[in-house]
From Swiss-Prot:
Protein name as it appears in the record: ATP phosphoribosyltransferase
Organism of this sequence: Brucella abortus (strain 2308)
Record's subunit section: Heteromultimer composed of HisG and HisZ subunits.
Keywords: Amino-acid biosynthesis, ATP-binding, Cytoplasm, Glycosyltransferase, Histidine biosynthesis, Nucleotide-binding, Transferase
Gene Ontology CC annotation, any one: cytoplasm
Family, similarity comment: Belongs to the ATP phosphoribosyltransferase family. Short subfamily.
Length: 231
């Protein structure tokens, strides 16, 4: 039975993933046609490569329609409810680093922690007659972090369809939850990360579907990739 490994379809994630695989001894033979999203691995007839977007990879792993995939941990945990029951993180690959963070306007000088934010959320309801608005593409991670971890209930998530960091200045939200690598975009938009506002430190990971996790072939591929990372 063949194993399907889903890889990022473009950009630096694709390049770095192919380099990790080659280091582990898996040379991916790319198709001549860029519109062909399947590839093969030299000498590995039972290993099929499928190129998808990083978010699609997380979703297909959750469905169990691919056995292994390389995608960001943030996408896995945002896309899949009860992610640890549906997939397993086999290895952190050391690239694609980014943090999912809680950021508020710099002018909120007295707000530096999630506890401060809890007070602000309650005050917003009293002063403005509405809930604190949070712009984000990460609604699941936001709900878990605010409601379950910090007990903050008085807020409303505003779905972000564009540049999330611009939402407070545009007036469509009061603050944001977003992903950042260097923080420069947040600073450019006069936003600051709360001291305890890092929701997740994410990076590219090798992930297996739980239904495939105990497969000897999947275990062998994952072990070989982990060994390659140590070289």
């Amino acid at each position: 039975m063949s194993v399907t490994l889903a890889l990022p379809s473009k950009g630096r994630l694709k390049e770095k993933t192919l380099a990790v695989l080659e280091k582990a001894g898996y040379k991916v033979v790319l198709p001549d046609d860029d519109r062909n999203y399947r590839a093969r691995v030299e000498g590995e007839d039972d290993l099929d490569i499928l190129f998808l977007s990083a978010s699609e990879i997380a979703r297909e792993l959750g469905y169990g329609s691919v056995d292994l995939g390389v995608t960001g941990e943030d996408l896995v945990r945002e896309t899949l409810a009860h992610a640890d029951e549906r997939v397993a993180i086999e290895a952190q690959l050391g690239f694609g680093h980014a943090d999912v963070v809680v950021a508020v306007p710099e002018v909120w000088r007295d707000v530096t922690t999630m506890a401060d934010l809890d007070d602000v959320a309650a005050d917003f309801r009293q002063r403005h007659g509405r809930r604190l608005r949070i712009a984000t593409k990460y609604w699941r991670l936001t709900q878990q972090f605010f409601s379950q971890k910090h007990g903050i209930q008085v807020y409303r998530i505003v779905e972000s369809l564009g540049a999330t960091e611009g939402a407070p200045a545009a007036g469509s939200a009061d603050m944001i939850v977003d992903i950042t690598s260097t923080g420069s975009t947040l600073r450019a938009n006069r936003l600051k990360v709360l001291e305890d506002g890092i929701i997740l430190r994410s990076q590219a990971c090798l992930v297996s579907a739980r239904r495939s996790h105990t497969s000897r072939r999947v275990e062998e591929i994952a072990a070989r990739i982990r060994a390659g990372l140590e070289i």
